[in-house]
């Protein structure tokens, strides 16, 4: 087994997965943050007589959370370990070589996966850039359409 080549491929796969999944993780964390802030503010309003120290602490923690700059949104260690396990154990290098499979084909397949993930990410970025109305909510679409016609939508 060609260890340096395997490590390069492994690192490439990890980087491609990180770049591909990070935007969706940021959106998911942003939605969770918004939901938790709303939930905590609602709980605070419901129990106006109680002390809100715990709720205020949690509320401040969620308000400080910035999904864009949070480094914990990278690939989790468990995901990395499972990918490493697949590359080390599940491929069974010696068995595949004994069966006549070329190891170069396995590496080519991994490189194709990396290229696919990079191209898919780039495609999604271009669609978002040149078709900005694609990910708008229904309310935002209604406001946009009303603005085109010259109407104001009440908030």
UniProtKB/Swiss-Prot annotation:
Biological processes, Gene Ontology terms: macroautophagy; mitochondrial proton-transporting ATP synthase complex assembly
Transmembrane segments: none
Superkingdom as given in the UniProt entry: Eukaryota
InterPro entries in alphabetical order: Fmc1
Compartments where found: Mitochondrion
Transmembrane helix is among the record's keywords: no
Keyword terms, alphabetized: Mitochondrion, Stress response, Transit peptide
GO cellular component: mitochondrial matrix; mitochondrion
One Pfam family here: Complex1_LYR_2
Family: Belongs to the FMC1 family.
Protein purpose: Needed for the assembly of the mitochondrial F1-F0 complex at high temperature.
Note: Present with 589 molecules/cell in log phase SD medium.
Protein's name according to its UniProt entry: ATP synthase assembly factor FMC1, mitochondrial
Organism: Saccharomyces cerevisiae (strain ATCC 204508 / S288c)
Lineage, highest ranks first: Eukaryota, Fungi, Dikarya, Ascomycota, Saccharomycotina
Encoding gene, per UniProt annotation: FMC1
């Amino acid at each position: 087994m060609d260890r340096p080549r395997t490590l390069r491929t492994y690192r490439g796969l990890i980087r491609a997965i990180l770049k591909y999944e990070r935007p969706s993780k940021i959106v998911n964390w942003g939605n969770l943050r918004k939901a938790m802030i709303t939930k905590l503010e609602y709980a605070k309003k419901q129990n106006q007589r109680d002390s809100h120290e715990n709720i205020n602490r949690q509320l401040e923690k969620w308000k400080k959370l910035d999904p864009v700059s949070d480094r914990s949104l990278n690939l989790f260690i468990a995901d990395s370990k499972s990918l490493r396990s697949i590359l080390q154990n599940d491929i069974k290098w010696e068995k595949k070589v004994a069966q006549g499979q070329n190891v170069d084909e396995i590496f080519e397949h991994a490189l194709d996966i990396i290229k696919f993930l990079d191209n898919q990410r780039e495609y999604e970025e271009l669609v978002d850039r040149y078709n900005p109305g694609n990910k708008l909510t229904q309310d935002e679409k209604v406001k946009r359409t009303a603005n085109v016609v010259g109407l104001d939508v009440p908030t």
